[in-house]
Amino acid sequence: HMDKVKAEAEADLNNAKVEEVTDVNGLKAVKITFDSGLLFNTSSSELSAASKTNLDNLAKLMKKYSTCAIDAYGHTDNQGWRNSTAEQSAQKNLQLSQQRAESVVNYLKANGVASSQFKNVVGKGSSEPVADNTTQAGMQQNRRVEVFLYASEQMVKEAQQGTLN
């Protein structure tokens, strides 16, 4: 079932990285990574006009697979903010990452995705880099929003009973 979700996500989401991962229960999950440069202006949590096509397509996908559970995680690079201490910058990055994750989730909810599908919406700040923060390219990769689609308890039960569509 998650294979279908992954295939459709790859077809519908331009400029997003779609991967199959294993969730905490050892089940397949689909991880969709959006470069935050595609979604937001620098230092902003307001969605850009360009991001809305991708998010509209994601909303359609999530409504189609309405039994999927969803987590959204915001991430930033480790760059400091002007006139801020390292500690203040880390706090601002954490807040920004949380606001970005919430912006994505609120947009999806406004486009018909059920609130009950969202399980975790978390800002990680710069705590989980995927690339080197000493280069521009690396920092860009670290500024991202990750959306995980995974089997809800309902889907797991249906799969075990053989009733999952």
Language-model segments: residues:
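Periplasmic peptidoglycan-binding/tethering modules of Gram-negative envelope proteins
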Residues: 1-69, 150-165
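Short connector loops/turns at beta-strand edges and beta->alpha or beta->beta junctions
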Residues: 35-37, 75-78
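Conserved hydrophobic/aromatic pocket- or pore-lining residues that grip, position, or stack substrates
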Residues: 55, 72, 121
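Periplasmic OmpA-like peptidoglycan-binding domain that tethers envelope proteins to the cell wall
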Residues: 76-158
